[in-house]
């Protein structure tokens, strides 16, 4: 009998132990689930929170601020005018500066490299993240200039009956001219040119007139061993039904061509081929991109635009209505920044409007600062 009673107590104890273990497991699972839910809700709130006000953290006086121009640069901006250029960090502090005297300066930046060209003149200044920039001159009036991360500069020059695209390394003491691509009247007039970040490729959009009809021709040039043929030309394509007004590299091997009502994605700059396109019924009012996204604002009516953002392979990630009066749009750090004369807004790529505010003062440029929110 005692052995049976002892066994029954053992069974009861074992069952109690199983119940406690099961209860502990259930409580643990419940705690994990609750913590996961709290984390998800907190993270969702954090990435989708909206702001209706702002606080001034940094303020810097800019002499002749209304005459200054701005472009994105490295981890801040470039501020430039007729008598000089200044690199500014996200706190508004000057990082480096350079002086010159130009009638119509136009700047371009890639990484820490900057070029400022005197449009219509013959002088250029190039900088590599420091004050001691270098100056150089070309033989003909400058139409456009752009720079690579290494400091290689592509310059479009206008001659009497033709145009020339020349590649320079201004930081070399000898043989600064690396390559020269002459064009003639039959090739058309270069509307826009861009240089790859590594300086190995150039894409140029030309405006041509054939049988009285305007059309676009896009040419791809490569300066590696692959492009060592006549004029370094490795590919070209005619767009008969649309005018290409802007060309932009997305990294070293991908290019986006913007037309009146669509954009076209090209890849492989050694053997260029069109990888995708998006065409719209509405006219493109603004266009913007980074290495991973292409965005457009389409004109819906006089007051409203439609903002669409796509990945580099053409997948749509954003489709939302915005005001149509924005004069500057850019994408930075996974957010879209828009501004007009006195109004600015920030959208996340998931469509959430992070910030929307009308300011008391006139906006010259809108760019991301130190990201704490």
Placement of each model-derived feature along the sequence:
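Non-cytosolic head/periplasmic domains of membrane-anchored proteins
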Residues: 105-205
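N-terminal Lys/Arg-rich, disordered targeting/topogenic segments
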Residues: 1-24
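Repeated scaffold domains used in trafficking and secretory/extracellular systems
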Residues: 63-72, 101-112, 140-151, 185-194, ...
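Aromatic (tryptophan-biased) beta-strands that constitute blades/sheets of beta-rich domains
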Residues: 47-66, 89, 93-102, 132-138, ...
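Solenoidal tandem-repeat scaffolds enriched in leucines and small polar residues
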Residues: 163-258
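Structural motif
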Residues: 44, 84-86, 122-126, 161-168, ...
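Extracytoplasmic/periplasmic/luminal assembly and interaction segments
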Residues: 70-120
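Hydrophobic membrane-insertion alpha-helices, especially the h-region
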Residues: 25-43
């Amino acid at each position: 009998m005692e052995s049976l009673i002892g066994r029954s107590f053992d069974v009861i104890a074992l069952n109690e132990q199983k119940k406690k273990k099961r209860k502990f497991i259930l409580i643990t699972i419940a705690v994990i689930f609750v913590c996961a839910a709290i984390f998800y809700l907190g993270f969702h709130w954090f990435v989708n929170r909206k702001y209706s006000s702002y606080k001034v953290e940094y303020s810097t006086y800019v002499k002749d601020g209304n005459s200054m121009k701005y472009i994105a640069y490295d981890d801040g901006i470039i501020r430039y005018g007729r008598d000089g250029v200044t690199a500014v960090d996200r706190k508004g502090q000057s990082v480096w500066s350079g002086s010159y005297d130009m009638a119509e300066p136009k700047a371009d930046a890639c990484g820490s490299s900057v070029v400022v060209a005197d449009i219509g003149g013959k002088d250029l200044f190039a900088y590599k993240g420091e004050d001691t920039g270098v100056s150089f001159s070309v033989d003909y009036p400058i139409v456009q200039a752009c720079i690579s991360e290494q400091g290689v500069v592509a310059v479009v020059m206008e001659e009497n009956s033709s145009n020339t695209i020349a590649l320079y390394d201004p930081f070399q003491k000898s043989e600064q001219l690396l390559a020269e691509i002459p064009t003639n009247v039959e090739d058309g007039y270069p509307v826009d040119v861009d240089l790859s970040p590594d300086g190995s490729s150039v894409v140029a959009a030309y405006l041509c007139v054939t049988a009285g009809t305007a059309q676009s021709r896009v040419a791809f040039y490569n300066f590696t061993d692959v492009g060592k043929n006549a004029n370094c030309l490795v590919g070209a394509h005619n767009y008969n039904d649309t005018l290409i007004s802007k060309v932009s590299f997305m990294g070293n091997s991908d290019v986006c061509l913007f037309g009146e009502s669509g954009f076209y994605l090209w890849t492989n700059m050694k053997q260029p081929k069109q990888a995708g396109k998006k065409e719209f019924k509405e006219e493109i009012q603004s266009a913007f991109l980074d290495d991973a996204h292409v965005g457009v604002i389409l004109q819906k009516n006089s007051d409203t635009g439609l903002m669409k953002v796509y990945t580099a392979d053409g997948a749509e990630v954003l489709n939302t209505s915005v005001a149509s009066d924005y004069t500057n749009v850019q994408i930075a750090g996974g957010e879209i920044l828009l501004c007009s004369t006195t109004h600015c807004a920030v959208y996340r790529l998931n469509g959430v409007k992070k910030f929307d505010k009308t300011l008391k003062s006139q906006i010259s440029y809108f760019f991301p600062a130190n990201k704490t929110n």
